[in-house]
Amino acid sequence: MSISRREFLKANAAVAAATAVGATLPVKIVEAAEQKDNIKWDKAPCRFCGVGCSVLVGTDNGKVVATKGDPESPVNKGLNCIKGYFLSKIMYGKDRLTTPLLRMKDGQYDKEGEFTPISWDSAFDIMADKWKDTLKTKGPTAVGMFGSGQWTVWEGYAASKLHKAGFLTNNIDPNARHCMASAVGGFMRTFGIDEPMGCYDDLEAADQFVLWGANMAEMHPILWARLSDRRLSSPTSRVHVLSTYENRSFDLADNAMVFRPQSDLVILNYVANYIIQNDAVNKDFVNKHTKFALGTTDIGYGLRPDHPLEKKAKNPGNGKSKPISFDEYAKFVSSYTLEYAAEMSGVEPEKLELMAKAYADPNVKMMSLWTMGINQHTRGVWANNMLYNIHLLTGKIATPGNSPFSLTGQPSACGTAREVGTFAHRLPADMVVANPKHREITEKLWQVPAGTIPPKPGFHAVLQSRMLKDGKLNCYWTMCTNNMQAGPNINDEMYPGFRNPENFIVVSDPYPTVTAMAADLILPTAMWVEKEGAYGNAERRTHMWHQQVKAPEGAKSDLWQLMEFSKRFKVSEVWPAELIAKQPELADKTLFDVLYANGVVDKFPSSECKGQYNDEADAFGFYVQKGLFEEYAQFGRGHAHDLADFDTYHETRGLRWPVVDGKETLRRFSKGDPYVKGDKEFDFYGKPDGKAVIFALPFEPAAEEPNEEYDIWLSTGRVLEHWHTGSMTARVPELYRAYPDAQIFMHPEDAKARGLKRGDEVIVASPRGEVKTRVETKGRNKPPRGVAFMPFFDARQLVNKLILDATDPLSKETDFKKCPVKVMKA
């Protein structure tokens, strides 16, 4: 392979730009330097964020030795961010777990005992005993699982089947509850169907971009590289950035806005009002394709019912609405004037107006992008609805460059948590357990008796913690997530439930995380390309990979664990007699037989596996992944969630659903979408009348605000070098050295007022706990006076101890962005 001087110079220029977002060299340059014939390369989606980059995985002598950006990927086009570059090292931490560990004392299980190695059979024996006893004495609502947006598609599907059709409980919820539940709520309320209508191609087609509380430069760096390329190559392109503190995304901002926490609701309504007042409503679009509704207000904060804020709320948890007219909506938002928005938000009026004008201009294609700043919000569903309001009022939606785009945090929060339906209230393809017709469809496809799936939603993530603490949830299995570090209000609501002597806690993880160390039984887990998998990214792209190396001896995939565990239960041991009477032939079968060896999941022979390895197929005697996928895909085909056949995904870099007649769909709800029929330009077919809903929703304050004692807002989040709790990235030496310790970022004047300076050790405290850290007054994050920021990747500084477990009452998603604290010298 040769490179010309011109190509070399061009590549260097590209690298200079890419370095700003932690991107790596284009693959062509990398290959020129490497050329190691003994390395075998295969594709896989990246293990980290929801962008869904494709990487080439290099294996040699049974180990992953290198990764690089995939030049054939339409997502990342050969680029990697810094985390993707070091993917090859995430599986080889020195403390990788390889044997089950049970708390024992004097040779027996003991809640206060020391972790002791045991066999897999022994681990499943004690698990089965605990589950059977709990199911018998307390019933299905006393067992549950906390899963992950990092599960593969079939892991999430197998887990959902095991609980909803096996253990007869809806007590399964993913960690996506903490990050994407408000996005789901926004989609379902406005459009009646989940996930973005646009795609990443809109980054190259949009004229202007608005980032609503999204630090894309660090959290979605490859998409930021594409956005940056558009901004720098188009003279008329502009970038507006809103956040509660300055971050690296502000480096590219033409219009930088730092707003007071919670006031984004005011700004959103101001923009809608501006559009109406300046006669910029796309009347033809609005009349044909939208309707208006007034949302219920004063809905509380998702706290325990006896909390004063819940007692005070008039309509706690009420998501109902009533129809209104356009004129009534216009009157509702008319009080959200420029002056009011500027006063409430602290943003300069001219900056707010500049952004509003861009939305209102019919000749400017607009792309809105948001993630945790909007979703992790006590009114996150409302904020999502209000963002869609702006795009619907102007008709700037579902066409190239006009895109309200909800970004995703995890690699399969879309593909697994949302599409598969691993939430406590959901079923596959946007169906819900509360709907009798949806339960009937699911039960028929799963070949289980009518009435198997409970109609009542199970415990959501925050409620699971409360129920564990209260002794109402007693057998609990956590997989592929580290909630004891990532979840809210750890001291008061989470840790007590794990250590409640009534409860038996199981954690499946490759490493001894904070969550694992609080458990009773730890199960060692296979990672990433140590198993065959599929993820679904933020643009509806489903992408598969083959197993490329063996897991360390003793570590088993989540899928194997779920299916093998199901063999320990006979139907007669877990189902009531009246349910068995409907299909008595199932009585002596195991849950494995009923759920996974049902003639559909097990119909594909192991010989169809095309990867070098497939440990699950070897263990169970059939192509497990293909069988689970093809059964699951039946839910969406013909129902606007169409997936291609299994084998096609292994031959591509992913396809965006709906996939009909072998063709993916770039944009939904507009011409080109196979579900938009005839000569229609738009059809919001998730709603029975084909019309999207524009909601009238007000500003409501945060659950807590700073006071005399706790006088500064704290926001938590991520950094470029680490992902979530650092359970993988902190074990990569290069990433750990790049960012070893969390700090609290403060305004220099706030630090000075407290007698602090950069580098000082401090105590950060809220009414719920305290952490010790160091002050940072410079660097990448620059909060305004009265605001501080602290990342949550550092297991030695559990900052989420400080966070109140207040949630959006509609989505049940926690607000991690607004916590009053005090900062004191240590």
Swiss-Prot record:
GO terms assigned for molecular function: 4 iron, 4 sulfur cluster binding; electron transfer activity; iron ion binding; molybdenum ion binding; molybdopterin cofactor binding; nitrate reductase (cytochrome) activity
CDD domains listed in its UniProt record: MopB_CT_Nitrate-R-NapA-like, MopB_Nitrate-R-NapA-like
Gene Ontology cellular-component annotations: membrane; nitrate reductase complex; periplasmic space
Assigned protein family: Belongs to the prokaryotic molybdopterin-containing oxidoreductase family. NasA/NapA/NarB subfamily.
Annotated signal sequence range: 1-32
InterPro entries given in the database record: Asp_de-COase-like_dom_sf, CT_Nitrate-R-NapA-like, MoPterin_dinucl-bd_dom, Mopterin_OxRdtase, Mopterin_OxRdtase_4Fe-4S_dom, MopterinOxRdtase_cofactor_BS, Periplasm_NO3_reductase_lsu, Prok_molybdopt-oxidoreductase
Main location: periplasm
Enzyme class at the top of the EC tree: oxidoreductase
Documented EC number(s): 1.9.6.1
Subunit structure, interactors included: Component of the periplasmic nitrate reductase NapAB complex composed of NapA and NapB.
Residue sites binding [4Fe-4S] cluster per the record: C46, C49, C53, C81
Amino-acid positions noted as binding substrate in the UniProt annotation, renumbered to this chain: F792
UniProtKB keywords: 4Fe-4S, Electron transport, Iron, Iron-sulfur, Metal-binding, Molybdenum, Nitrate assimilation, Oxidoreductase, Periplasm, Signal, Transport
PROSITE patterns, A to Z: 4FE4S_MOW_BIS_MGD, MOLYBDOPTERIN_PROK_1, TAT
Biological-process GO terms, alphabetical: cellular respiration; Mo-molybdopterin cofactor biosynthetic process; nitrate assimilation
Protein name per Swiss-Prot or TrEMBL: Periplasmic nitrate reductase
Obligatory cofactor(s): [4Fe-4S] cluster; Mo-bis(molybdopterin guanine dinucleotide)
Annotated Mo-bis(molybdopterin guanine dinucleotide) binding sites: 83, 150, 175, 179, 212-219, 262-264, 372, 376, 482, 508-509, 531, 558, 716-725, 800, 817
Domain 4Fe-4S Mo/W bis-MGD-type: 39-95
